[in-house]
């Protein structure tokens, strides 16, 4: 199955690239595909495979928290080089043999070409074993989202206490050493009966004219739904209680159970937003879906 799409561009290459994960019953590996039109994707190959046995990323590697040149919502998703390398934070798991076997970790990867990735640090950047790990995240750390703003790096990540997931924030001055924000979680769960009652996860943050917007997924009301939150300071967020897109929105049934884990791109050719997401149907089949802000041919 496939999951966790993230679309980006690399200087000197035409078109777009997308990383995603493939699950082979043992764990996650990250793959990359190419597209000229944001609809048809081909040239699939491995981007980053399993880490060494006994280490924090042996059971799974989930690329997608890239260092971009610009985080404006309409900017090209162009990767930014730092000292000759592109960088991505990544989610990881230490054990093979199943789906997201806890506890999860986060690492940092680097690449010279944006296609093939390797570890940039041999220890995790976030772990449940670190001294500043909070109660809300004590059981598992999941997927990061990297943002650079005014010389600082922000990592919006989801984590779990039991079966409850929320979004927290870690900060860094160099990409390699991170400290958690003292008032985590920054996007907590909603009240009973809300669309994010159980999960507020997988935040993707962009600048939109005069404020920041986070696209995340909530779990509640018998499904996973694409939701949004807003802030001006990156710390204090206001959640829109009504989903942007609800599970079951596609009449084919491909997202009848979950619609989550988005990647957003503005296509100037047709002046439309393209939002990729992980679609899960009623029997658990996973794949990558696409919704757009305007009809496309």
Where do the protein language model's features map onto the residues?
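Hydrophobic core segments of beta-strands in well-ordered, beta-rich domains
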Residues: 3-24, 32, 44-47, 63-101, ...
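Surface loop/turn signatures of beta-propeller and other carbohydrate-active proteins
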Residues: 1-11, 39-79, 115-148, 176-207, ...
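Short active-site-adjacent helix-start/loop capping segments
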Residues: 25-28, 56
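Beta-propeller blade signature
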Residues: 31-38, 104-114, 168-174, 227-234, ...
């Amino acid at each position: 199955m496939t999951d966790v799409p993230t679309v980006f561009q690399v200087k000197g290459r035409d078109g777009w690239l997308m990383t995603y994960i493939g699950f082979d019953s043992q764990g996650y590996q990250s793959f990359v595909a190419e597209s000229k039109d944001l609809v048809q994707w081909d040239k699939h190959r491995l981007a980053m495979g399993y880490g060494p046995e006994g280490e924090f990323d042996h059971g799974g590697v989930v690329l997608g928290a890239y260092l971009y040149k610009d985080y404006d919502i309409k900017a090209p998703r162009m990767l930014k080089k730092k000292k000759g390398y592109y960088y991505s934070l990544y989610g990881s798991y230490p054990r093979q043999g199943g789906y997201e076997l806890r506890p999860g970790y986060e690492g940092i990867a680097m690449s010279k070409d944006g296609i093939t990735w390797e570890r940039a640090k041999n220890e995790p950047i976030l772990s449940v074993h670190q001294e500043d790990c909070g109660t809300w995240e004590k059981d598992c750390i999941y997927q990061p989202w990297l943002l650079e703003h005014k010389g600082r790096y922000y990592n919006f990540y989801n984590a779990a206490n039991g079966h409850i997931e929320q979004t927290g924030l870690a900060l860094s001055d160099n990409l390699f050493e991170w400290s958690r924000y003292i008032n985590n979680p920054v996007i907590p769960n909603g009240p009973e009966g809300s669309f994010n009652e159980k999960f507020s996860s997988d935040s993707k943050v962009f600048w939109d004219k005069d404020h920041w917007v986070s696209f995340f997924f909530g779990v509640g009301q018998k499904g996973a739904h694409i939701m949004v939150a807003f802030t001006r300071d990156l710390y204090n967020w206001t959640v829109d209680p009504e989903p942007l897109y609800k599970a079951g929105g596609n009449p084919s049934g491909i997202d009848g159970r979950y619609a989550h884990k988005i990647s957003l791109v503005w296509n100037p050719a047709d002046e439309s937003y393209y939002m990729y997401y992980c679609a899960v149907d009623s029997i658990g089949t996973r794949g990558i879906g696409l919704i757009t802000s305007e009809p496309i041919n």
